C-alpha cells in the first residue's frame, strides 16, 4: 500500500468511517441488492465471505474465540504499520482521538455514556477490577452463580481468603423451563450481609441464560451491587446496559464481538465509579490520589497500550452496525435454534435449554467427560469443525456460519453417536 492510500485509510479510521476489504462488496451495497430481504441466505453467504477462514476448518466456538472480519484485521495491520513507520509522539497523537471514537462507538452500541466505558484487555481483567476494587469489609458477603467463569468465581474466593469476606454460590436448575426458576434461588440466598451479586449473562458451560434485569431489580431493592460477566452476549445480543440495569458489565472483544484480540470492555454505572478502586495506576492516572482521567477511564490506566487494536474497536462496531445489531442477534438465535432442533430430532440430549428466553448462542451436547477430547478432535480432523469440550461438546455458531455449516455439524455428530455415549 502506498503512503497516500495508507493516509487515506487512517483518515477514514480516525473519522469513524469503516471500510470493506478490496474486492469484497460492501455490506450496505449487499443489503441494497437484496432489497428488503437481508434475512435471505444469500446475504449471510456474503457475510461469511467477509471472514478469511477456510471451509475445511470452520470455527463454531464463538464462546471462546472468533475470527475477525477482514475489515477489522486489515485495520489493525494498517494502524500498527503506521506506528512502526513513525512512532513519534507527533504521529501517535491521533490515536487519542481514535481511542475516544472507539469508546463512543461502544457506548452508543450499549446505550450508555462514554464516561462509563473503560477499554481494558479482556473479560478476566474487567472481572478482577470489580473484584479487587469494590470496598468490601470483613464479613461482607458476595453471592455468585455457581456457573460463573473462574475470574468471576474463584477470584472472589481468593479475595475472601485475603480480606475475610465470604462467598456463597447459588445453584440453578439444570433443566429450567421458566424464568422464575432462575430468579427464586437467588432471592432465597440473599441475606443482610450480601453486598455483591456476581452473575453471568449466558453460561459458557451450560448455555443457560440468566434473567439479568429481574435479578438486578431484586438486588437493587437491597442496595446490592450487581456485576455481570457478559462475555457471551457482547456482539451476540443487541444489548442496552441501561435497560439491563446492572452496575457493572465485563466482556471481551475477541469473542462474539469479532474484534481485535486483547481488548476488553468494562462498563461501570456512573453512580458507582467513584467507589471502585483501580487495579493498576500508571502515568495516565495523574500525580495524586484523585485521577486526572474522567469517569471509567481510570480503570484503563495501564501505561503503553496497543493503540492499533484499540482504534480498530470502532471499525468492529461499524461492522456490526452495517449488519444491524438486531439482525446479528436474530441470526445467531436462528443458527443456534436450527442446531438445537436438529440435534434434538436426532435424539441427542442437550445441556442447553431450547427456549431462547433461557439461552443464547451457546449450544452444548451431553458427552461423558472421558470422551469429550476424542469427540472434539474427531469433529475437527474429520469434519472440519472447531468446537469445545466445555460442559460437553460445545458448538457456538455466529454470523460467519451458514446453514450448510449447521447441517455439517449435525451430520458429524450423528456419525459420532456411539463415540459420544448417546447410542
Put a short name on every predicted segment.
Residues 2-423:
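Pyridoxal 5′-phosphate
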